[in-house]
């Protein structure tokens, strides 16, 4: 039996937006069963709620952003990834700005916040999206694909012409029946190249970026004094992003995901293509007395 989960307590954090550079106050609150993840812009009058829904994605340039009722919520993918990795279904995310705080560029601080708040099971079974048929989307040589699989696994391949990202460190697979999100994925940070800085600044992107919240590379090396957290941290972060982007489908995935040079835009296109093909997926749950789901989550943390 796998139940829905929410937070036991409310918890708050402060940070800066990666792209806006704005200071942002964030509050995570418990939510009732079947509520889902809902963002709330408390700086607006009246307050505007924006559900975590793939159909509301309007921004995929260097982040995943949502728009609803005139309100924007930017850079949701790292928190969404942490929620997916810890199996949290229902939460209210209050924000004082249009962008989530970037924290250290990974999902690790969000995992810490969620565990500090306490994670509790609720009265109704968790709902999974089971992949029944292969769904694939492409953009040039980029590919993102769902396939049926009894569990949840992700494979990702990146290609960067850079000495710090050799081919042998450009491929990663993770299966959540045997691997732990917290240790294997959550600490992988976002990354960027000095050569792209001018492009980003011209578009008012990356204004809050620094070596405190991203891996920065020049033409030859990593510039961060502390180096990398994993030898293949770059591709692990791409998996972290994908987990967050896919959680916008509205439920935990039971299936296999494969990405080749994919990013936020193609991940969102894949989720939309899946949801539009009703023969390709189904809702499933595992009530008491039935089989266990073929994916494991950490035990609830009762703070």
Curated annotation (Swiss-Prot):
Pfam families named in the record: LpxC (PF03331)
SUPFAM superfamilies listed in its UniProt record: Ribosomal protein S5 domain 2-like
Protein family: Belongs to the LpxC family.
InterPro entries in the cross-refs: Ribosomal_Su5_D2-typ_SF, UDP-acyl_GlcNac_deAcase, UDP-acyl_GlcNac_deAcase_C, UDP-acyl_N-AcGlcN_deAcase_N
Biological process (GO), any one: lipid A biosynthetic process
Catalysed reaction, written as an equation: a UDP-3-O-[(3R)-3-hydroxyacyl]-N-acetyl-alpha-D-glucosamine + H2O = a UDP-3-O-[(3R)-3-hydroxyacyl]-alpha-D-glucosamine + acetate
Name of the coding gene: lpxC
Role noted for this protein: Catalyzes the hydrolysis of UDP-3-O-myristoyl-N-acetylglucosamine to form UDP-3-O-myristoylglucosamine and acetate, the committed step in lipid A biosynthesis.
GO cellular component, one term: membrane
Protein name as annotated: UDP-3-O-acyl-N-acetylglucosamine deacetylase
Pathway assignment: Glycolipid biosynthesis; lipid IV(A) biosynthesis; lipid IV(A) from (3R)-3-hydroxytetradecanoyl-[acyl-carrier-protein] and UDP-N-acetyl-alpha-D-glucosamine: step 2/6
Active site: 264
EC number(s) on file: 3.5.1.108
Organism of provenance: Xanthomonas oryzae pv. oryzae (strain KACC10331 / KXO85)
């Amino acid at each position: 039996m796998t139940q829905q989960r929410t937070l036991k307590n409310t918890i708050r954090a402060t940070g800066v937006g990666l792209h806006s550079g704005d200071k942002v106050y964030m509050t995570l609150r418990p939510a009732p069963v079947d509520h889902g993840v809902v963002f709330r812009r408390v700086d607006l009058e009246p307050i505007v709620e924006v559900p975590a829904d793939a159909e509301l994605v309007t921004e995929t340039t260097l982040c995943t952003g949502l728009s609803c009722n005139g309100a924007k919520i930017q850079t949701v993918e790292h928190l969404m990834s942490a929620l997916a990795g810890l199996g949290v279904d229902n939460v209210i995310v209050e924000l004082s700005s249009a962008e989530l705080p970037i924290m250290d560029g990974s999902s690790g601080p969000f995992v810490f916040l969620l565990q500090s708040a306490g994670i509790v099971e609720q009265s109704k079974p968790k709902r999974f999206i089971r992949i029944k048929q292969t769904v694939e989307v492409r953009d040039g040589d980029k590919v993102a694909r769902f396939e049926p699989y009894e569990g949840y696994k992700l494979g990702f391949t990146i290609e960067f012409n850079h000495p710090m990202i050799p081919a042998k460190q450009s491929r990663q697979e993770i299966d959540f029946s045997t691997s732990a999100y917290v240790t294997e994925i959550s600490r992988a940070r976002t990354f960027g190249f000095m050569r792209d800085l001018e492009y980003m600044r011209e578009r008012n992107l990356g204004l809050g970026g620094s070596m405190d919240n991203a891996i920065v590379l020049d033409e030859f090396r990593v510039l961060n004094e502390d180096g990398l957290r994993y030898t293949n941290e770059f591709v692990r972060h791409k998996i972290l992003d994908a987990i967050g982007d896919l959680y916008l489908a509205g439920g935990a995935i039971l299936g296999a995901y494969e990405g080749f040079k994919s990013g936020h835009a193609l991940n969102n296109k894949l989720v939309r293509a899946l949801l539009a093909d009703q023969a390709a997926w189904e809702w499933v749950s595992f009530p008491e007395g039935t089989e266990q789901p073929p994916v494991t989550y950490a035990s609830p943390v009762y703070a």
